[in-house]
Amino acid sequence: MESEYVLCNWKDQLWPAKVLSRSETSSNSKRKKAFSLEVQILSLDEKIKLDSTETKILNKSQIEAIAASLGLQSEDSAPPTEETAYGRSLKVALGILNERTNLSQASTSDEEEITMLSQNVPQKQSDSPPHKKYRKDEGDLPGCLEERENSACLLASSESDDSLYDDKSQAPTMVDTIPSEVETKSLQNSSWCETFPSLSEDNDEKENKNKIDISAVMSVHSAVKEESACVKDEKFAPPLSPLSSDMLIMPKALKEESEDTCLETLAVPSECSAFSENIEDPGEGPSNPCLDTSQNQPSMESEMGAAACPGSCSRECEVSFSASNPVWDYSHLMSSERNFQRLDFEELEEEGQASDKSLLPSRINLSLLDDDEEDEELPRFILHYETHPFETGMIVWFKYQKYPFWPAVIKSIRRKERKASVLFVEANMNSEKKGIRVNFRRLKKFDCKEKQMLVDKAREDYSESIDWCISLICDYRVRIGCGSFTGSLLEYYAADISYPVRKETKQDTFRNKFPKLHNEDAREPMAVTSQTKKMSFQKILPDRMKAARDRANKNLVDFIVNAKGTENHLLAIVNGTKGSRWLKSFLNANRFTPCIETYFEDEDQLDEVVKYLQEVCNQIDQIMPTWIKDDKIKFILEVLLPEAIICSISAVDGLDYEAAEAKYLKGPCLGYRERELFDAKIIYEKRRKAPTNEAH
């Protein structure tokens, strides 16, 4: 049986056990060798002897099958006091198997990582003799393992001294490679522990350690792992008991656990009785290759003396191992080894360079050294610049009052207040206009995700206007992209380069309808006279004068259309029985009159009267002269409409024909406020058209 842990039949059950010793027994068969094994039941102190044929190799599938049959739960499902001895033994065995599996997987990843690092580190050779490293031949390795298992757990300090002096007398040898299979088997068949002195002793001994031989580290692939482990022991670990060199190879994948795991073990003095069971014999095993024997001989003797006495162990080291849980020493070994792996590989390189400063290096690759100096990473200061969402001159979407989202230009920005002054994109943009100040939250970037949806919404009421704005912005971006123009959209609109786009708004078919900001139509017209300035600060009541005139004109429409009170008067004018100044001007006019006074301000009222007059013309079509039939619309607007309105005013208001005609010529009676607003509108239109005419 080559396995360290087996399954044996004890008390009618398969119990996991640890092999303590094996001895060959006589057998009738010459081919098969029988062994007598002495095993210890895991988590129990029971030691039994049995034949090798009565045991099975311990594997995970068998343990899980037994646990499933017993209905065992996970490790954290119940307190340890409630578990049976058989259940504890199975869980200890399962934990050992899991540790083996993780160890083998991590060693594979460790080899790959060190292989990549070895390609980037320059090799260095020291004049000092390399550290001693001993191992037995591969053929004698099984015998060596048997000797370790059969040897006594404790040795006298004199024996350890002899082994140390023997190590010193041997000649220095180069690091030899050990196959991965031998490494794995040595990890499985050896257990060990270490003592932890005080921090001050650790610091003193760090100064006395020899530096690592970098050339030996990078020469052979497997030697890299051994030497890196040795350096970690020299830098961070206190003096250790002589251990197998194979046990120092630990994968870097086990770095995750912190050093608290090892420190917590110092507080368990009651378990120190099992301390000596896991220390190997220094006389038979290879010496520690990481320690200088000439410097560390007193410390090694003190270690062996401390290991020989359990009582002194509890007083000096306070390191203990549980006798009831044999897997505890194994897990502690793993956690302590993880602490040695915390040294970064770059620190190894720096340490090797520091130790070889005064030595003459051999076979130095200068190009590699130069590359290392160039690849040295200096401290980096990462500056996070805040990207402002809006900038001056940026085109955005802005929603104002009842209008939909409309393209606008940012004139200025106040960062602290997070506000921007914007102007709508329209046919009469002017950089001198005062924009409206709004919060950033009310703005959207022009190329946002909702761009198409905003355009479609604006097309519902401003189809031509929004299309013109989009074409203006697209043309501006094309000019910026090709480099033919540099500047903001406002500057582009005022320049001659934008005239092909601006001239579209001057066409008769274009509806000049754009959203207006409050300061365009309200404040600027009100600045015409002092009277309107005062009114801008007062609450303006709605104008009722126009409504009163519409009601009075409604009576005139009823008299003309419904009562047909003007029909006889109109027929008399057409027949020539009554004279009319409007008929004379119509006959003498050489061209179409540019302006006609309608008197009616409501278009509905005017349409109603014109339709009635067309019916009258159809009735008298037979008797109408030929010169009237050629242009009926002109005859209705210039002759019949004024005569009908004058006749209705005379009849409704009780005036004679001359007074009614004078009232018609005077037109509607406008109020003072209506006149001011109308004059201000005219002046504003003239001012607005003046810059555009100069640009052309």
UniProtKB/Swiss-Prot annotation:
Entry GO terms, CC: extracellular exosome
Stretches with biased composition (Polar residues): 119-128, 290-300
Span of domain PWWP: 392-453
Pfam families cross-referenced by the UniProt entry: MUM1-like_PWWP, PWP3A-B_C, PWP3A-B_N
InterPro entries according to UniProt: MUM1-like_PWWP (IPR035504), PWP3A_3B_4 (IPR040263), PWP3A_3B_4_C (IPR048795), PWP3A_3B_4_N (IPR048765)
Region (Disordered): 119-143, 278-303
Keyword Phosphoprotein attributed: yes
Keywords associated with the record: Phosphoprotein
Residues bearing PTM Phosphoserine: S128
Similarity comment: family membership: Belongs to the PWWP3A family.
Protein name per Swiss-Prot or TrEMBL: PWWP domain-containing DNA repair factor 3B
